[in-house]
Amino acid sequence: MTKAHSIGIGGESIATVHHSADSDRWLFFCHGFVSDKTGSYETRCERAVEEGYNAVRFDFRGSGDSDGKFIESTLSAKIADLRAVVEHFEPTRYALFGSSFGAKVAFHAAGAVRSALSPETIIARSPVTYNRTFDAYREIVEAEGILRYDADHAIDGRFFDDFAQYPFRSVTENLDVPVAIFHGSEDESVPIEDSFEAAAALNGDVLLEKYVGEGHRFSRTAEDRLRQRTFEWLASVVE
């Protein structure tokens, strides 16, 4: 069963969908930079329910059905969105799944402050870890003032002013929960070498799987493998 929620934050709302299961285990999904909660996130949530997890997908403000403008959605804002969603459901235990930039949100949200509402584990697909991934975009913004991805998505200097506050070393210094990373060898957006470096730097246990021939977007075969391995790994690290 699914139920839509509108979660308030700063006078705006975050469009959220809860896929319910008869369990105290929860899995929250964070979408990528210019993505939203539809498509693969819906079917990932359905698989999570089959595996006995309450699953939650949501749109960061400025994306999908949530309020706000994308150009105003900084990393700080996305972290606040994730925390608001988790706090709304008050899970006693949960894991985070982040794809691409959604993984960076998950890492920094989890690594900032350890509390009763911190995740037990993090799953990251093709994760943005080191800020250098956005260096080319920053250069465009410095030269032109704005970078437009399409009619609905653009960033300006505000994004990078905020982004600079979140080096990946702040995660490696504070995060100690188990992490699983799944990354394609031919990723054209985020080089897989970043994930090898991140895995070596993280303090907790790390599973890192290289998907040979896969790019930033996974094929259907790789997506199926990702889901299978995700829940096998969760079963091995979560009591």
What are these regions (language model features)?
Residues S115-I155:
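Hydrolase active-site cap/lid region
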